[in-house]
Swiss-Prot record:
Role noted for this protein: Pectinolytic enzymes consist of four classes of enzymes: pectin lyase, polygalacturonase, pectin methylesterase and rhamnogalacturonase. Among pectinolytic enzymes, pectin lyase is the most important in depolymerization of pectin, since it cleaves internal glycosidic bonds of highly methylated pectins.
GO cellular component: extracellular region
Family listed: Belongs to the polysaccharide lyase 1 family.
Disulfide pattern: 82-101, 91-225, 322-330
GO function term, MF aspect, one: pectate lyase activity
Annotated gene: pelA
Higher taxonomy: Eukaryota, Fungi, Dikarya, Ascomycota, Pezizomycotina
GO BP: cell wall organization; pectin catabolic process
Name of the molecule in the record: Probable pectin lyase A
Length: 379
């Protein structure tokens, strides 16, 4: 479907007052997640206190009512890195993490890099946690979140994660999952991130729902040297079920998302806006059902070649196949000034049978609502 460009689509988010309790419930694969449940809310006031609450063994509801700035809390490092994309002011440089420059960019010029240590590794989040922002006040600056090593039953809602060494590749990921289960990420904003805004690592991440979140790729530095972040969203787990619904993915030049290994992704009612490169990158083992989404000013909705499988819900007749596996027909996607998105692989749709499936609305609903409703402060 084609539609005209909406005026003001990139307008600022509309702040609203939110209560310090979970709003709504997870749809899709993470349906039933409870986080900290009925635990009494705690309000950390320092970065140390926040780290302690997130990582302890008690069920907790942790309310963020201020900015927790980790910048400088772990010192800085000056080392030799590299410049794979040149040394122009808008180009990201790379930290030589795990000898990445040495092994993968041997011809890149060497450069001196100085980065903030806090951004490199996120805060560990243990099981049975709810992390809630109060209004638009809950911000974690300079450090991400890390849900790993069997952690499960976690809700992250209405917070922002910002400013993780944006000048440097390997400068840090906003949210990392690896060997996790039952995680709901909702109404989260990420901005100015050195590496991935969201990454699901190589171990199984099982049941995850990412909803109503704003991935903001506007940056002074990027791998494409044009102000469009390249490192967006990376789904590469060994047995992952991901519902990705109602999200606003804005101003990226690639990897938004990259899907591979053994990942079943249901991308529904999202809004991709303004990309100089590609949105989806689908490697071997990536299985993507995309329906009811909006692609506006996206040069390449999916990068070629597609090594996994993709069902793009191309038309109402073809979309009736979804009824067998989802219990309803799929919704067509909408396009404005965007490239081709038309593949219709169906063999993998059987993997949706018997699972919790998110509902879908016509793409026009996402077109009108997602830019102003996604992200922090919009519960």
């Amino acid at each position: 479907m084609k539609f005209a460009l909406l005026s003001g689509v990139a307008a600022g988010l509309l702040p609203v007052v939110s209560a310090v309790s979970v709003s709504g419930a997870a749809e899709g694969f993470a349906k039933g997640v409870t986080g900290g449940g009925s635990a009494a809310a705690v309000y950390p006031t320092t970065t140390d206190e926040l780290v302690s609450y997130l990582g302890d063994s008690s069920p907790r509801v942790i309310v963020l009512d201020r900015t927790f700035d980790f910048t400088g809390t772990e010192g800085t490092t000056t080392a030799t890195g590299c410049a794979p994309w040149g040394t122009a002011a808008a180009c990201q440089l790379a930290i030589n993490q795990n000898d990445w420059c040495t092994n993968y960019q041997p011809d890149a010029p060497s450069v001196s890099v100085t980065y903030d240590n806090a951004g490199i590794l996120g805060i560990t989040v243990a099981s049975d946690k709810t992390i809630l922002g109060s209004g638009s006040s809950g911000v974690i600056k300079g450090k991400g979140l890390r849900i790993v090593s069997g952690a499960s039953n976690i809700i992250i809602q209405n917070i922002a994660i910002t400013d993780l060494n944006p000048k440097y590749v390997w400068g840090g990921d906003a949210i990392t999952l690896n060997d996790a289960d039952m995680v709901w990420i909702d109404h989260v904003t990420t901005a100015r991130i050195g590496r991935q805004h969201l990454v699901l690592g190589n171990d199984a991440d099982n049941r995850v729902t990412v909803s109503n979140s704003y991935f903001n790729g506007v940056s002074d530095y990027s791998a494409t040297c044009d102000g469009y972040a390249y490192w967006g969203i990376y789904f590469a787990g060994s047995s992952d079920l991901i519902t990705f619904k109602g999200n606003y993915i804005h101003h990226f030049s690639g990897r938004s998302p990259k899907v591979q290994e053994n990942t079943l992704l249901h991308a529904v009612n999202n809004y991709w806006y303004d990309s100089t490169g590609h949105a989806f990158e689908i490697g071997a083992g990536g299985y993507v059902l995309a329906e009811g989404n909006v692609f506006q000013n996206i040069d390449t909705p999916v990068q070629s070649p597609i090594e996994g499988q993709l069902f793009t819900s191309p038309d109402t007749n073809t979309n009736t196949v979804c009824a067998t596996y989802l219990g309803r027909n799929c919704e067509v996607n909408g396009f404005g000034s965007s490239g081709t998105f038309s593949q219709a692989d169906t063999a993998f749709l059987v993997n949706f049978e018997g699972k919790n499936i998110a509902s879908a609305s016509p793409y026009a609903d996402a077109q009108s609502s997602v830019p102003s409703s996604a992200g922090q402060g919009n519960l």
